[in-house]
Amino acid sequence: MEITDVRLRRVHTEGRMRAIASITMDHEFVVHDIRVIDGNNGLFVAMPSKRTPDGEFRDIAHPISSKTREKIQIAVINEYERVGEYEDAPNYEEAGAS
């Protein structure tokens, strides 16, 4: 499996979320709402999730292997850093509270 595209929307809010990404795998499957979070040990990727009735969060989609998780993390964070350097990049969109 290869990550063939990463789309990124930077988020400018007070919280730790820095961006929301969508990834395409093998030009055939897209996963939306992947979050880039600024954690205590640097940036990390959080998979899309929803809140259950009892208040817990459950992943909607997630990689099964650590190798695949690492591929996703590297691709998304690399795109986040690339877009940060070039605000006029074609995939750059700004999102967040006005």
Swiss-Prot record:
Keywords, alphabetical: Cell cycle, Cell division, Septation, Sporulation
Pfam families: SpoVG (PF04026)
Organism superkingdom: Bacteria
InterPro entries from the UniProt entry: SpoVG, SpoVG_sf
Any one GO biological process: division septum assembly
Protein family: Belongs to the SpoVG family.
Xref: PANTHER family: SEPTATION PROTEIN SPOVG-RELATED (PTHR38429:SF1)
Function in brief: Essential for sporulation. Interferes with or is a negative regulator of the pathway leading to asymmetric septation.
Protein name: Putative septation protein SpoVG
Organism: Shouchella clausii (strain KSM-K16) (Alkalihalobacillus clausii)
Organism classification: Bacteria, Bacillati, Bacillota, Bacilli, Bacillales
Gene this chain is encoded by: spoVG
